[in-house]
């Protein structure tokens, strides 16, 4: 059945369909709805962290334990989580993980403008950039397969248009 979804809902749906067991995030617009939606799936243990670094480290722990995990935060949160991100980038994964940063190149709901694609480049991470809600579902699912196949962390950075503004039909 087709259903209308925001990008944040679609990211959560993709993680659920990929078999994610653990989700962590620090709340902040425009990424809050990702964990809120993940928490509606009883198969996923979802928790708010006291900051973005702790959210990242919790997801690392889940991955090291062999669980598929996801961590999400707003764009400026990646500044706080950069230290564990760079360490994790060369550690590899036991259980697949996807890092989602809700970038805001146009300052729609945040105090500053930041484009986190440079973090993926600097950490030498594979990055997927969905263009609509259906791609959010599909790319998040594919990220787990790719990450586990190549023993690497995957990074996704959807734009505000994809996450919040457009409501695209999704097959989920």
Residues covered by each model-derived region:
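Conserved small/polar residues in nucleotide/adenosyl-binding loops
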Residues: 155-164
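Thiamine diphosphate
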Residues: 1-133, 138
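Conserved anion/nucleotide-ligand pocket segment
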Residues: 146-153
């Amino acid at each position: 059945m087709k259903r209308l979804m925001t990008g944040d809902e679609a990211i959560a749906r993709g993680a659920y369909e990929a078999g994610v067991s653990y989700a962590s995030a620090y709340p902040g617009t425009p990424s809050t709805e990702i964990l809120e939606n993940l928490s509606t799936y009883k198969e996923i243990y979802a928790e708010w962290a006291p900051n973005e670094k702790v959210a990242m480290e919790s997801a690392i722990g889940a991955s090291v334990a062999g669980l598929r995990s996801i961590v999400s935060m707003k764009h400026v949160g990646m500044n706080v989580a950069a230290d564990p991100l760079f360490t994790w980038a060369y550690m590899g994964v036991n259980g697949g993980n996807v890092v989602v940063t809700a970038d805001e190149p146009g300052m729609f709901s945040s105090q500053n403008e930041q484009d986190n694609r440079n973090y993926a480049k600097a950490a030498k991470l594979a990055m997927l950039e969905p263009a609509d809600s259906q791609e959010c579902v599909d790319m998040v699912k594919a990220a787990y397969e790719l990450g586990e196949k190549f023993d690497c962390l995957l990074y996704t950075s959807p734009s505000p248009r994809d996450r919040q503004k457009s409501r695209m039909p999704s097959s989920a």
